[in-house]
Amino acid sequence: MDIKRTVLWVIFFMSAVMLYDNWQRDHGRPSMFFPSATHTAPAAAGGASGTGATTAGDVPAAAAGAAPSTTAPAAQAQLVKFSTDVYDGEIDTRGGTLAKLTLKKQGDGKQPDLYITLFDHTAGHTYLARTGLLGGDFPNHNDVYTQLNPGSTSLTGDQNTLKLSFESPVKGGVKVVKTYTFTRGSYVIGVDTKIDNVGTAPVTPTVYMELVRDNTAVETPMFSHTFLGPAVYTDAKHFQKIDFSDLDKNKANFEKSADNGWVAMVQHYFASAWIPQQGAKRDIYAEKIDPALYRVGVKQPVAAIAPGQSADVQARLFAGPEEERMLEGIAPGLELVKDYGWVTIIAKPLFWLLEKIHGYVGNWGWAIVLLTVLIKAVFFPLSAASYKSMARMKEITPRMQALRERFKSDPQKMNAALMELYKTEKVNPFGGCLPVVIQIPVFISLYWVLLASVEMRGAPWILWIHDLSQRDPFFILPVLMAVSMFVQTSLNPTPPDPVQAKMMKFMPIAFSVMFFFFPAGLVLYYVVNNVLSIAQQYYITRKLGGVKKKPA
């Protein structure tokens, strides 16, 4: 009995430790077991910009087509502000770069009057989307564009779309007109690059589209760290995350060319992604370009353009929340930016079910409660088998203690006597372990569903819980969880081994302290799960006791 419970506690504890260590590494913090280099590299002498950790053979030398350096010459430029129903933003006329993007429907958890800013370019933070041409002395993101047809830059009540166009200076016989199309209610931005050959010779440019970001960590609740960094998706390799640390060490491994897929920057709850046209050949690159500054992008070749002719390259830019159903409708595999890790195969159906329940009850907190009840109901036969095994072990515990006392000076005889007792009573000391172990992947999957789902962000439950993605402000749920864990422990007999007895008392305290800083939605799940487990164990144990009291 005591051995089995110790094994279960060790499994639970190690699972929690591994999850936390995974958060540390995904969030750019050193592993508790395998420390790695930090993301921020020493500043280069003189502040020079370069390609840094470019993988050999990945991006050619600058003259042959690498995206330009981030260092821009001094020139007059301005910020063009715009507004839609979902965005407030700024386009920098230097390069026609999308330099700031605020999500108007995503409030700040700590300051309700503020909104989440995804793209930004300030002294302390850089995150932007930009494009340009390679293959010659053509317009790129360092050149100052001119806004065409300046007028209203806001999406008015009678408009469904807002178009903003910017024209480059002529360079290398080429002029570029870049048009952003914003659609009402959509987090997908159309980006059209029109290339006009105004020279006297054919040109064969390449369009690059990239996301540039520093490695500044996103502020999240304690113990809620998820992946931050570039990602690539192709039909051949599917979803590939790229750690900033791998770019630091020039060890990033990802698909380098395709005619499908997308590239993205991923963070907790939000993402951005360049989505070129399906079937268009493109090269994919990801690299470090400055101390603590990285980029991921695609380079799409354009067929030769004769003098006086033009070519259009169309792409889409997603920038918004990681809402799973919305992402599924935008591009194949884009929903994978909502990263469940190795439990995706279980987590996705769980989120589908959670979403269906929410559709009926209209409250994510109650949806979590009902989903937990459903999961416990599904696993009731396994739980019953576990509790029955525990009850049988509890019955023979006095005899086990007597054997231990009798043979305490001879461990070999004691083990033989215990095995004989198990055989005689037809009891498996580990009989209650397997049913619990089988359920662990499901519980971990639900944990990641609640952690990764932006739908929980800002979602209230009842009374004092106004945001399920933030910790309980009054620590009521963590206290309830601590109480429930102590009740669960008290339902089982105290192990005869003093060390194991201390461990059984320490574990609830350790987990309770850790859960004080978990998002309220996660703690709610564990509280409900514990309460249901206590009820199940009480019911099954009482039922077994009633059966044994009946006359033969």
UniProtKB/Swiss-Prot annotation:
Keyword terms of this UniProt record: Cell inner membrane, Cell membrane, Chaperone, Membrane, Protein transport, Transmembrane, Transmembrane helix, Transport
A single Gene Ontology CC term: plasma membrane
Keyword Nucleus: no
KW ATP-binding (keyword) present: no
CDD domains (alphabetical): 5TM_YidC_Alb3, EcYidC-like_peri
GO molecular function: membrane insertase activity
Family: Belongs to the OXA1/ALB3/YidC family. Type 1 subfamily.
HAMAP family: YidC_type1
PANTHER family: CYTOCHROME C OXIDASE ASSEMBLY PROTEIN COX18, MITOCHONDRIAL, OXA1
Protein name, entry field: Membrane protein insertase YidC
Origin species: Burkholderia cenocepacia (strain ATCC BAA-245 / DSM 16553 / LMG 16656 / NCTC 13227 / J2315 / CF5610) (Burkholderia cepacia (strain J2315))
